[in-house]
Amino acid sequence: MELLEVGHESAEEAVIVLVKGDVDSSTADDLRDQLTSALDVATTHPRRLVVVDLVEVNFFGSAGLNALLDCYEAGRVAGTAVRLVADHPQVLQPIQVTELDRIFEIFPTVSDALQR
């Protein structure tokens, strides 16, 4: 099991949340905290956009899905879009199985997410 590293940065195009490692019940609160903080920053960002980069995530459990869903719902209320970046089955499969791909826009790269 790999420890979770998560943080966010405000870029010209969006607030980007970088996630690396395993997202499970023991690490999801850290993810949730960073997502909440990123949403707070995004409310004053010109594009009102949060991009969550999950490319370096090795395991993505249901607690992580719940954190993303909470972020999406809070963003919707605040008028801030939330987009995901994922390119491998460890992250995509749980999102697809739970049909969260119907509400999240998912892109293979951060660049693609920013261009949309």
PLM regions and their residue ranges:
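Actinobacteria-biased recognition of intrinsically disordered, low-complexity terminal regions
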Residues: M1-E2, R116
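C-terminal alpha-helix
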Residues: A38, A113-R116
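Amphipathic alpha-helical interaction surfaces in cytosolic regulatory modules
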Residues: S25-F104
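Residues that form or immediately flank small-molecule/cofactor binding pockets and catalytic motifs
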Residues: A11, P89, S111
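STAS-typified acidic loop motif
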Residues: E2-T36, E56
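General small-molecule cofactor/ligand-binding pocket signal
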Residues: G7, V85, F107
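Residue-level signal for pocket-adjacent positions within structured domains
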Residues: L18, E99, T109
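Short acidic-hydrophobic, aromatic-tinged amphipathic segments that line or gate anion-handling sites
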Residues: F104-T109, A113
